[in-house]
């Protein structure tokens, strides 16, 4: 699996990440974990060719690992780690578990995300009946992850463009060439990730 996106993510400036678009997508992914984490969203073949059910939690964890990514917010990382630890516990329901969590900060985040019942997606059938998020997890969760990753790349490309416009860098041919090379590398990583997922 490509580790390029992880490198892109780690290179970004730390300040003000909460205001960036990818942080909003990160929050949407965590919202899906809180609401539907234990739900089975698809089946995948294991190494022996057997179909195994994959929960929302497991899908997100595996998808992040593929690109060497982690969530920026420490509480989001903790939610995902604890969710993965307990996903196979008998009777585990992510929303109930996190809302009743002993850590008040974590419980507060979970309560806020669970109580915001804005539908993450708006899928309509031919009868114009609105299909709920839970019925479309196999489409919704991969889309949330793609949007999250796309936003990471977009933020990095924007950061490079600002650096290229800096007069100090403009006057330094070597620095300029290095930035252009980095821009191409990030764009290529982004393109390869898209090709891998569309095949």
Task: Give the role of each language-model region.
Residues 1-9, 190, 197-199:
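Single conserved hydrophobic/aromatic residue that forms the stacking wall/gate
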Residues 3, 7-92, 110, 115, ...:
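Non-catalytic protein-protein interaction segments used by genome-maintenance enzymes to assemble
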Residues 65, 74, 78-192:
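Bacterial replisome coupling helices
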């Amino acid at each position: 699996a490509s580790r390029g996106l992880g490198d892109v993510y780690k290179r970004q400036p730390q300040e003000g990440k909460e205001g960036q678009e990818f942080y909003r997508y990160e929050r949407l992914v965590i919202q899906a974990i809180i609401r539907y984490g234990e739900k089975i969203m698809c089946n995948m073949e294991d190494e022996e060719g057997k179909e195994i059910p994959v929960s929302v939690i497991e899908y997100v964890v595996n998808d992040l690992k593929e690109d060497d990514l982690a969530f920026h917010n420490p509480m989001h990382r903790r939610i995902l780690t604890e969710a993965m630890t307990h996903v196979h516990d008998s009777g585990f329901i992510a929303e109930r578990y996190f809302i009743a969590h002993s850590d008040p900060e974590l419980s507060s985040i979970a309560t806020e995300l669970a109580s915001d019942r804005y539908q993450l997606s708006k899928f309509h059938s031919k009868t114009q009946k609105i299909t709920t998020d839970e019925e479309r997890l196999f489409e919704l969760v991969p889309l949330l992850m793609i949007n999250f990753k796309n936003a990471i790349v977009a933020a990095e490309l924007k950061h490079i463009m600002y650096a290229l416009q800096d007069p100090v860098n403009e006057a330094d041919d070597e620095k300029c060439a290095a930035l252009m090379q980095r821009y191409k590398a990030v764009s290529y990583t982004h393109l390869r990730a898209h090709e891998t997922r569309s095949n």
